[in-house]
């Protein structure tokens, strides 16, 4: 266990110093090349779990220490161990013993004794500490909801009826949802295939299948052959809301990693241009399309400045955002984001919207999409755009009865729940 704790502590420490977990975790794993697959898997679980509940775990650690430690790695090791003692099924004695061993490997002479003392104090005083945290107005909400205070305050203001449920969803494990390629099968048939292979799943309409337990894509029947793709249920709305028709010219303006790109091509025979400003990420789009045996014109470019001689009938603008609606998938986001980042994203989004509008044909439709739950990036952004473009009209989102039943949507905002992430959709038509 101590190897997994050590790897997780390296990853958590790097995230708390500003690194993205998608970069920090592989780097931490690479520092222990002899770790077994089980140790590597456990390290990933501990990294995600510690950051998912960092607000709570850190509140306990602050109460246990007289002052913050100067050693970031030992701090992170304590955070990982306290997370285990609070949320993991591992035996308390084993967690403490292995954390002390990990501290010894980390080399500071004082580390073993301090880690041992802090963790044993935690076990003795856990109930008292919980009451102290609950009574401390400076940290009680951050500890209870494991989100930054500014984030909690914003959700209280913008979602007075839903803020607690949104925060709870943000701390939950995300579902694994598949999109069935309608050219090859449908959700009901595919669920029957899964049942024959003892994989429990639920179909959420014609295309979406939610697995009871996540599995590796290598174990997903038909994935390699393009029968299914991994895509959140809420994200599957994008291609459907575009109102696609045969032979249309389509621009997917922020295409990587290509989930929505592939979905568009599954639904209609169209001429699609996939644009992204990152060439390496565009390679992922190419890989996705190859698996689906679909073709698009892939272009590297910035959606805020991109020019094209073509006027497009449909444009998908899945713009950069705070990603506040997908924090359960990216647990580091809530601790890396700052409230000031919202305004920076809004400037970028406005520039993209304004530029793409020039590429849209008359009577064409542009679907504006974010994976954010902050209104500044969503309807407020659209309202500002509409004030400046009198040839733009926001259309109602037309959902099928099946989608209406399963999707929790409020004025274009998908409120994150156990079935789907938090996304925003606005469909704009050019007159």
Residue ranges of model-derived segments:
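S-adenosylmethionine
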Residues: 1-431
């Amino acid at each position: 266990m101590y190897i997994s704790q050590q790897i997780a502590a390296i990853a958590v420490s790097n995230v708390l110093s500003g690194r993205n977990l998608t970069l920090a975790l592989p780097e931490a794993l690479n520092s222990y090349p002899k770790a077994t697959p089980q140790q590597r898997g456990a390290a990933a679980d501990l990294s995600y779990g510690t950051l998912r509940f960092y607000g709570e775990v850190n509140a306990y650690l602050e109460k246990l220490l007289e002052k913050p430690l100067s050693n970031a790695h030992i701090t992170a090791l304590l955070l990982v161990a306290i997370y285990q003692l609070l949320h993991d099924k591992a035996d308390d004695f084993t967690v403490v013993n292995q954390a002390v061993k990990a501290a010894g490997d980390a080399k500071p002479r004082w580390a073993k004794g301090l880690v041992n003392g802090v963790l044993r104090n935690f076990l003795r005083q856990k109930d008292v500490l919980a009451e102290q945290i609950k009574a401390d107005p400076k940290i009680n909400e951050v500890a209870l909801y494991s989100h930054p205070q500014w984030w909690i305050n914003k959700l209280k203001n913008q979602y007075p009826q839903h803020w607690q449920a949104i925060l709870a969803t943000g701390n939950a494990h995300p579902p694994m949802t598949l999109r069935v390629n309608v050219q090859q099968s449908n959700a009901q048939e595919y669920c029957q295939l899964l049942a024959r292979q003892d994989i429990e799943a639920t179909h959420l309409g014609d295309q979406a299948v939610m697995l009871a337990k996540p599995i590796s894509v290598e174990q997903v029947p038909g994935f390699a052959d393009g029968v299914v793709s991994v895509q959140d249920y809420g994200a599957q709305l994008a291609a459907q809301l575009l109102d696609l028709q045969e032979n249309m010219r389509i621009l997917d303006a922020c295409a990587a990693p290509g989930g929505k790109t592939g979905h568009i091509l599954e639904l209609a025979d169209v001429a699609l241009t996939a644009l992204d400003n990152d060439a390496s990420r565009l390679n992922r789009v190419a890989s996705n399309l190859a698996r689906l045996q679909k073709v698009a014109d892939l272009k590297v470019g910035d959606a805020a400045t991109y020019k094209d001689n073509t006027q497009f009938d449909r444009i998908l603008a899945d713009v950069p955002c705070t990603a506040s609606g997908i924090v359960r998938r990216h647990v580091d986001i809530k601790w890396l984001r700052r409230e000031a980042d919202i305004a920076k994203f809004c400037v970028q989004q406005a520039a993209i919207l304004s530029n793409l509008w020039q590429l849209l044909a008359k009577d064409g439709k542009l679907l504006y999409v974010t994976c954010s739950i902050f209104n500044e990036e969503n309807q407020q952004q659209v309202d500002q755009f509409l004030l400046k473009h009198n040839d733009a009209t926001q259309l109602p989102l037309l959902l099928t009865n099946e989608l209406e039943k399963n999707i929790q949507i409020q004025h274009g905002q998908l409120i994150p729940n156990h079935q789907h992430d938090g996304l925003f959709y606005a469909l704009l038509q050019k007159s």
